[in-house]
Amino acid sequence: VENYHHQHQNVRTENGIEYGDTVDKMDFDYLAKVTMLNVLTATALADAPPAPASATLGGAVTSNTTVRWDASLGAHAYRIYQRRADAQDWSFVRELQGTETVLEGLIVDDHFVGVSALGKNGAESTITFAGLPPRR
């Protein structure tokens, strides 16, 4: 929990209260854990191919959703994720090669879809949110 007497404050004293980010108020064990998590995340992302630049959905007036995405340089395969519009977590759907798939029985109005790129080393990019197809 943030302590706003110490975080995001200029160093000063007002009404007997010391404000500001100072070394004596640091939690170095916590800082080390956060730093390690950041390093591990950056390493995993650096080993992965870039995420697809864009992804689109089709499926109006049908019970299937067509997903298309741009190829990513260095991608060996792609992972498709979906989640209901009222859910917060992605669910893995399938892994495939190519840049298009049809998700049978997945209604586009009720779900969000995303695509990530997978390297030969197994490293995975961030997920690209698939929106509606561009207007023409």
For each of these PLM feature ranges, what is it?
Residues 1-136:
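Secretory-pathway/membrane protein signature
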